[in-house]
Amino acid sequence: MTQQSILFIDRDGTLIDEPKTDFQIDSLEKLQFEPNVIPALLKLKPYYRFVMVSNQDGLGTASFPQENFDKPHNAMMALFKSQGIEFDEVLICPHKPEDECDCRKPKIKLLKKYIDKKLFDPTTSFVIGDRATDVQLAENLGIRALQYDREKLNWDLIVEKLLPKQTALLDRKPRYAEVVRTTKETDIKVQVWLDETGMNDIKTGVGFFDHMLDQIATHGGFRMNVYCKGDLWIDEHHTVEDTALALGTALKQALGDKRGIQRFGFVLPMDECKAECTMDLSGRPYFKFKAKFKRDKVGDFSTEMTEHFFQSLAYTLMATLHLKTKGDNDHHKIESLFKVFGRTLRQCIKVEGNELPSSKGVL
């Protein structure tokens, strides 16, 4: 059977509002849908199957009678169906945490069929839910999570992440590159879509580094996948360095002959950190860096690797790159550098016409 792209979606707090008083939807009066959930699911419907997965504490007991659950739940399902939204299955754990069952999220017994029969494609399936247990469920399934939040990651934003959006001009071929780099220390694959926004898939084994790479793509206005298996039992040096080399190569290949690009970029955002970036996709690598860090590590990432990452990237991107930042918090200083680099790169790769931005006739 062909593996499918499936969204495993939480119910309370994700599809419908969860009352903060008793955390039970046990009457029609309590049934309220999350903002824009129906338009969002309709947009996602052509690309994904839907499976609802929910913990319902004490369902079927005196504390939560079955009939009290059924009435609003059936009304919710009927409304979804009337709007063209159907779920392949609705999977519910009725137990309380103290019951220590095997089916309560983040445990995976409810989804055993999907695992044993390999019904979902782990590269294109997601868990969507508002709780940390939903994120943990995704980890247990080996897929990615989108932790729903009405402000930070609402249904409109989820659609933006899950459905890549083409940004290329109508008369231009979308710019894409894939680079595979294998050495004795690392095995890396980088895919870059310069004219597409959406969900980035980044797995290097270094959590903080993954987050920083995502900042580059997000603020750069493009999409990328980065997969790296490195010798992390030694340290993260080879992983970070080789990823930078592969990413720079992929960006350079995706840019092609650079015809029509803006080429130059400069950003100076003012936040709690003052980060500054100047870049020229000149075809001549040059790098200058100014930042001081008080700590040796931020999470699992060595602060000294920040400079080395950008130096390696500038070398294979064949770019002139100046970076500096000031601030009090090392986490924020490093993040400001990755963000400002992404924003500057966004300017440089923007297509403005069809002319080559160089008097030499080549970049």
Curated annotation (Swiss-Prot):
Binding positions (Zn(2+)): 93, 95, 101, 103
Names of the cofactor(s): Mg(2+); Zn(2+)
One GO term of the biological process aspect: L-histidine biosynthetic process
Gene Ontology CC terms, in alphabetical order: cytoplasm
Chief place of localization: cytoplasm
PROSITE patterns: IGP_DEHYDRATASE_1, IGP_DEHYDRATASE_2
Assigned EC number: 3.1.3.15, 4.2.1.19
UniProt region (Histidinol-phosphatase), positions on chain: 1-174
Pfam families from the UniProt entry: Hydrolase_like, IGPD
Region (Imidazoleglycerol-phosphate dehydratase): 175-363
Active site: 10 (nucleophile), 12 (proton donor)
The UniProt record lists the keyword Cell cycle: no
Pathway given in the UniProt record: Amino-acid biosynthesis; L-histidine biosynthesis; L-histidine from 5-phospho-alpha-D-ribose 1-diphosphate: step 6/9; Amino-acid biosynthesis; L-histidine biosynthesis; L-histidine from 5-phospho-alpha-D-ribose 1-diphosphate: step 8/9
Localization terms from the record: Cytoplasm
Family the UniProt entry places it in: In the N-terminal section; belongs to the histidinol-phosphatase family.
HAMAP family: Bifunc_HisB, HisB
NCBIfam families, alphabetized: HAD-SF-IIIA (TIGR01662), hisB_Nterm (TIGR01261), Histidinol-ppas (TIGR01656), PRK00951.2-1 (NF002111), PRK00951.2-4 (NF002114), PRK05446.1 (NF003937)
Name the UniProt record assigns to this protein: Histidine biosynthesis bifunctional protein HisB
Species the sequence originates in: Pasteurella multocida (strain Pm70)
The organism's taxonomic lineage, starting at the top: Bacteria, Pseudomonadati, Pseudomonadota, Gammaproteobacteria, Pasteurellales
Gene: hisB
